[in-house]
């Protein structure tokens, strides 16, 4: 029985990386189902579900979900992916994550995910939303295994979780990536560099005068650790 061969999550909106993951799954003939069916029904063929933000976070006081409120006050929310991950064989992370937002799961929870064998962390934030991503990997050596109890890298298969965490994975489709990226630069970036910035250039600027801007200051600890 395969209740969930692929379990795809996304952060906010319908991101390009997330759409790419779903496109790949479509060509493997893995059927997409609703999050509700993923939890409530059993299947004798591989399935996957895609979770919207409202599906995988909940307000700490169980208030009605509002995306704008979550974006502005992410610390008031917690993850509710526990039930999904308990039923998943594979989890693919393809969302944007802000450090103020809740992690997808905690280290203490992972021993409850007895079916979970593989995590494909396309998001690839080391020690970020997916705690099993203890390091980034390369195309040449894309995966590693961690022990579910110790959270340390291991060569043993018993009680191990395979993790793929290639930090530049979306760039590994040269033609598609180059075309999309080029069109985006020409149409969505250059006009606002040469003209009046509507905020997108400032929001995308990571450093200025050799310093991280406040929005990206969380990267300093990662850089300093290298």
Model-assigned labels for residue ranges:
Residues 6-7, 31-43, 194-205:
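Flexible, glycine/charged-enriched surface loops at secondary-structure junctions
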Residues 18:
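N-terminal Rossmann-fold NAD(P) dinucleotide-binding loop
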Residues 23:
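Catalytic core of tubulin tyrosine ligase-like
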Residues 3, 118, 123-226:
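Adenosine-phosphate binding glycine-rich loop
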Residues 1-5, 9:
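Single conserved hydrophobic/aromatic residue that forms the stacking wall/gate
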Residues 43, 47-153:
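Rossmann-like adenosine-cofactor binding region
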Residues 13-14:
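Glycine-rich Rossmann-fold phosphate-binding loop(s) that bind the pyrophosphate
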């Amino acid at each position: 029985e395969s209740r969930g061969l692929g379990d795809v999550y996304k952060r906010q909106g319908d991101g390009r990386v997330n759409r790419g993951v779903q496109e790949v799954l479509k060509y493997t003939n893995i059927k997409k189902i609703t999050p509700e069916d993923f939890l409530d029904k059993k299947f004798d063929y591989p399935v996957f579900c895609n979770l919207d933000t409202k599906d995988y976070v909940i307000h700490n006081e169980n208030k009605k979900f509002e995306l704008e409120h979550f974006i502005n006050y992410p610390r008031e929310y917690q993850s509710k992916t526990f039930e999904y991950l308990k039923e998943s064989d594979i989890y693919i992370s393809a969302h944007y994550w802000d450090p103020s937002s809740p992690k997808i799961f905690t280290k203490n929870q992972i021993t409850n995910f007895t079916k979970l064998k593989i995590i494909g962390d396309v998001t690839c934030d080391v020690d970020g939303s997916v705690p099993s991503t203890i390091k980034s990997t390369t195309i040449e050596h894309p995966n590693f295994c961690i022990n579910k109890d110790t959270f340390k890298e291991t060569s043993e298969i018993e009680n191990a979780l395979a993790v793929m965490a290639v930090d530049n994975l979306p760039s590994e489709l040269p033609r598609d990536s180059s075309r999309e990226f080029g069109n985006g630069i020409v149409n969505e970036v250059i006009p606002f560099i040469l003209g009046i910035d509507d905020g997108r250039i400032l929001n995308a600027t990571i450093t200025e005068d050799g310093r991280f801007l406040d929005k990206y200051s969380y990267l300093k600890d990662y850089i300093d650790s290298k």
